[in-house]
Amino acid sequence: MNNHDKIYDMFDRNSGAKPLICVEMSGNHQGSLDVAVEFARSAKSAGADLLKVQVYKPDTITFQSDFPDFKLSGDNDWADYGTLYQLYEKAHTPWDWVATIFTEAKKLDLPVFASPFDQTAIDFLEGLDCPIYKIASPEITDVGLIEACARTGKPIIMSTGLASSKDLDDA
């Protein structure tokens, strides 16, 4: 059984089976590769079955702009960043870190998969042999992204939290 088959078998759950636990790293690395690696170790020691990372660059998912559509406002923690670009710049995981996280997680026998946000991220993740792709809920209408993930021949998890019935039909 190859490594991908082992991972895919994790999703084959019967009633009464223990839950599949996936830990999301997202921006929880606090801007430190050491924290990111320790996060993976902690996830494994806490019993996680899988680790998920987000792979994007601020320049590929938004514009550096002060126009209202790109500003973060309101009474929430994100508003402190000012713009979407500034938020994504702070929260993104540098791609060389992603490669290190994949390597370190493999040593821990902790499978890693990812949410890519564009073709460049998919190309990068294919180089890491990412076994599964997850489409984030806000990207559920990005048919090009979904098709690009599908072309890899790997399973896709689609988050539907923000999706309407029409969005699901289109996806």
Please provide the spans of the model-predicted regions:
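Conserved, mostly hydrophobic/aromatic
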Residues: E24, A43, L125, S159
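Catalytic domains of carbohydrate-active enzymes, especially glycoside hydrolases
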Residues: E38-K57, L128-D129
